[in-house]
Amino acid sequence: MIRANETNDCGGFFMDIDREKEGKCLTVTVPCYNSESYLERCVESLLKERDGLEIILVDDGSTDRTGQLADQYARAYPDVVRVVHKKNGGHGSGVNAGLMLANGIYFKVVDSDDWLDEAAFHKLMSVLRFWCRTKEEKRPDLVVCNYVYDHLEEGKTKAVRYGNLFPSKKSAGGTKSAVFRRNSILSCMR
């Protein structure tokens, strides 16, 4: 578990984190605020593909049991799940906190009220594991996937497809569907 620290210059987070988890292929950051009613579905969908996966649950100052649920996952899956508890700073600050602590070669954000289809996530992880085994200079900076947006309250479903957006020889696959190479994002922040 990582707690915010007001005294350093990295957005308030300890940067002397455990680096033994390096070598993960994908870090998924889940920004959470008062997510206790749906966090379990989100995390359980991610845990179906633990090999090469790091999950960072960022509790953004929740006032419900979100933080305790996140801590339970970290205790149950210590090699996969890490938790950050921080003062409420909004969705973007939660994403940034996860990015700063990520060890994966690739980085993805999954909102706490979202979940991943098991077959689709398996296919994505298979592709990412392939790229993670290749030489760094050959890895794509961005992998984009189709996704389905289910608006449960309205009973509406919308499939979002990216097939014709990229040249076919140049693509490997909104941030809902994007997986970024972590170092590519960090280089933009320097």
Feature roles, as predicted:
Residues 2, 6-190:
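Nucleotide-sugar donor-binding/catalytic module of glycosyltransferases
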